[in-house]
């Protein structure tokens, strides 16, 4: 179910939205906004995953592996 939400944007973003619609890439300003919000959602999800990985790494302590060991392990795992 769709919900109507009003959003205020500055002239620069309004101009960008208009150009995207006029180019034919999007059928409406709403499509541009939905696309932008989907990208923001994906970016936020990736950022959260990175933050969690950093926290996990910091909490795991120091590794006994050398940089060379880590590189070799990655190469083997990804068959590079």
From Swiss-Prot:
| Keywords per UniProt | Toxin-antitoxin system
Q: Which InterPro entries match?
A: ParD, ParD_sf, Ribbon_hlx_hlx
Q: Does the keyword Acetylation apply?
A: no
Mind telling me which SUPFAM superfamilies this protein's record contains? Ribbon-helix-helix (SSF47598)
Q: Name one Pfam family in it.
A: ParD_antitoxin
Q: Does the keyword Lipid biosynthesis apply?
A: no
> Which residues does UniProt call coiled coil?
none
Which biological process annotations from GO are given for this protein?
regulation of DNA-templated transcription
* Family per similarity comment: Belongs to the ParD antitoxin family.
Briefly state the protein's biological role. Answer: Antitoxin component of a type II toxin-antitoxin (TA) system. Neutralizes the effect of toxin ParE.
> PANTHER family recorded for this chain?
ANTITOXIN PARD (PTHR36582:SF2)
Q: What is this protein called?
A: Antitoxin ParD
Native source species: Escherichia coli O157:H7
Q: Where is the organism placed in the taxonomic lineage, from the top? A: Bacteria, Pseudomonadati, Pseudomonadota, Gammaproteobacteria, Enterobacterales
Q: What gene codes for this chain?
A: parD
